[in-house]
Amino acid sequence: MDYRDVEPLREILHRVLVRYLTVTPAGLILDKDERPRAKVEARILSFGGARTLYRKRKPVCRSLDGVAAVTDPSKACAECEDRQRCTPQVRLDLIVEQRALRCLLAFTSARNFLEYEARLRRDGVFIEQVLHQISVVDRGTWGELRFSLLDPS
């Protein structure tokens, strides 16, 4: 698949209601009725900055670009009084088993992804052109994501 082939998929993904990939210490959950998986193969369509404001462990505001809130696009993150309480994240738009999924990475998983993406970029690999393995390391109360290349061509 040529990396330009994913552009129409990106456009569709940003316009539809997307399911979120759930990360647990036991693994990745693609659908609420499925058991956690230790690893999945994925195509990464896009990534970028995101922010989520949590109250009592529930998201109350989210931005998928770090600029404006999803629920109220006129609400600018830069001017929001709650900005300091937001969790900075990395947004991944994925295709896993022909399903469009979104994953929001915070802290360690975000760092792992950004280091992985920088390594690919340094090696001249377009992240959209290859298959990736995403695996979970059990950290007790949370799951840390690790990224590796499956398709080096």
Question: What is each model feature region?
Answer:
Residues 1-100, 140-142, 146-152:
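OB-fold ssDNA-binding interfaces and closely related basic DNA-contact patches used
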Residues 88-149:
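Extended serine/threonine-enriched, polar tracts that run as long, contiguous segments within proteins
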